[in-house]
Design a protein with these regions (language model features):
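Conserved pre-ATP/AMP-binding loop-to-beta segment of ANL
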Residues: 58, 219-226, 232-255, 262
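Conserved AMP-binding A3 loop
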Residues: 100-103, 251-275
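Conserved AMP-binding/adenylate-forming
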Residues: 64, 69, 73, 82-105, ...
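Conserved S/T- and glycine-rich ATP-binding loop of Class I adenylate-forming
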Residues: 128, 145, 176, 250, ...
């Protein structure tokens, strides 16, 4: 039930054959809702509306990893008719208390990171990839792409080298954001993705891996291996405005997990995302 006492959804079409009836929100039974507010046509405009209305609210929160604990466990699995025991390592994370920032503080970082991406030559003519754990920096990268009209791909951080390669090759990605712990996966396939020239990472990375990746991309035009914090610093010193975008523009290509074959890219426009 809605707050007004209405049913949250109403039936607008009966079922047919193997298909059940169609339901829609009681607020819009005649047609699908196309946008959350008049005048909003893109994800950037949606986020700007949130900034105007809720900018001083501490709505962004995260917890840092304080420590990592590992425990050995014996598990039993069945192979054919036989039960086989094997020892597996389980990892548990000790987390800090929640840390909060306001919407305004979050989007200040987005403005700076987006400007830093612009300085790296990433724009509406290039495709970006986010291969990272879902956290605040993931959101900063995504919102920065929305701001600059950069189509970005999302790749599960659990993808192996082959799956990641598909999500870089197929859309002809030129830049990627990832976490330090995932650089070893990127390193394995970076030779097979010659168009990739900008690698942005956060966290503390292994210097040996950084050196090897730098060596692999150094011959590519305008190649850069750069830390997330440095992108923000560069952007802060060279601020640029948002790029114009439209509802019909492709905003995101979401890659599947690849559990039933190679990952598949689902193309989403701004219109799709705000509807």
């Amino acid at each position: 039930m809605s707050k007004q006492g209405h049913k949250a959804s109403v039936q607008v079409s009966p079922g047919e054959g193997a298909f059940g009836p169609i339901y829609r929100s009681f607020l819009s039974p005649e047609h699908l809702v196309e946008r959350p507010h008049e005048g909003i046509h893109t994800m950037y405009e949606l986020m700007e509306e949130a900034r105007k209305r809720f900018g001083d609210k501490k709505n962004i929160a995260w917890r840092d990893i304080v420590d990592e604990h590992q425990e050995q466990k014996v598990v039993t699995k069945k192979i054919g008719d036989e039960e086989v025991k094997e020892t597996k390592t389980w990892t548990y994370y000790e987390l800090s208390p929640y840390k909060y920032i306001t919407i305004n503080e979050f989007f200040k970082t987005v403005d700076e990171f987006a400007s830093g991406m612009h300085q790296l030559g990433l724009n509406q003519k290039t495709v970006f990839n986010i291969f990272a754990s879902t956290n605040v920096s993931w959101q900063v990268a995504a919102q920065s792409c929305f701001r600059q009209g950069i189509t970005f791909c999302t790749s599960y951080d659990t993808l192996g080298p082959e799956g990641l390669q598909v999500s870089l090759e197929e859309p002809e990605v030129q830049g990627i954001f990832t976490n330090a712990q995932h650089l070893k996966v990127l390193e394995k396939i970076i030779d097979q993705t010659p168009l990739l020239r900008v690698v942005i990472y956060d966290g503390e990375a292994d210097e040996n891996i950084l050196n090897r990746i730098h060596s692999k991309i150094s011959g590519r035009p305008n190649a850069v291996l750069i830390h997330y914090d440095e992108v923000i610093r560069n952007g802060k010193q060279n601020m640029v405005g948002p790029a114009p975008t439209q509802g019909k523009d492709v905003a995101c290509i979401m890659y599947t997990s690849g559990s039933t074959g190679k990952p598949k890219g689902v193309i989403l426009t701004n219109d799709n995302l705000i509807a």
